[in-house]
């Protein structure tokens, strides 16, 4: 919970990736709060109050996963809503002439997105495809598996692009982005 709160303020992409990992952690522990407490939460150096807050947070996520039928897979609706907001912002940035750097980064990463979609779920949105790729590589690294140079290059470009989108998301939420010229 505490990590999620900080990530949500600084990088929405990192926040989503973290939340997807938390969903997987909950599943790995059988959606059982006592098992999560014993094998996961108790490993952290929390004060008693923090531990209680963390357990409440996990308990709420477990409840949502049960209610939404996400025990076996899929993302929680709270994460889907944020992803939709990010996807919507992506569309607005591409439509606007005020963000040429974003457009350039998008077209730089587009061949990688096309290749990933051809290999995987063709129905996924481009942004979700990018996040899935980042999550997949993160999991490979955690498992200390080898990542090919081609994949490393693609992930580097995707990371830059998604980082830029995350920065625009935070800026839009804090200051508001202007998508049109003032004289229109």
Model features per residue range: what roles?
Residues 2-73:
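N-terminal interaction modules that seed assembly of large macromolecular complexes
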Residues 114-184:
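Glycine-rich, aromatic-bearing surface loops/beta-hairpins
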Residues 29, 47, 65-68, 72, ...:
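Short secondary-structure junctions and interdomain/linker hinges
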Residues 76-137:
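A charged, amphipathic interaction segment
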Residues 67-95, 173-184:
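Charged low-complexity stretches with an acidic bias
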């Amino acid at each position: 919970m505490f990590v999620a709160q900080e990530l949500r303020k600084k990088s929405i992409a990192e926040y989503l990736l973290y939340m997807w990992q938390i969903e997987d952690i909950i599943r790995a522990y059988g959606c059982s709060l006592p098992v999560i407490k014993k094998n996961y939460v108790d490993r952290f150096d929390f004060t008693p109050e923090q531990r209680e807050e963390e357990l409440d947070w996990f308990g709420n996520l477990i409840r949502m996963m049960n209610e939404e039928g996400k025990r076996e897979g899929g993302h929680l609706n709270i994460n889907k809503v944020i992803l939709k907001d990010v996807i919507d912002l992506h569309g607005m940035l591409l439509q606007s002439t005020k963000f040429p750097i974003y457009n350039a980064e998008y077209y730089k990463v587009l061949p990688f997105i096309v290749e990933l979609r051809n290999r995987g779920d063709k129905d996924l949105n481009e942004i979700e495809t990018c996040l899935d790729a980042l999550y997949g590589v993160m999991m490979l690294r955690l498992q200390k598996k080898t990542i090919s140079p081609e994949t490393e290059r693609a992930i580097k470009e995707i990371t830059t692009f998604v980082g830029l989108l995350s920065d625009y998301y935070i800026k839009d939420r804090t200051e508001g982005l202007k998508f049109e010229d003032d004289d229109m």
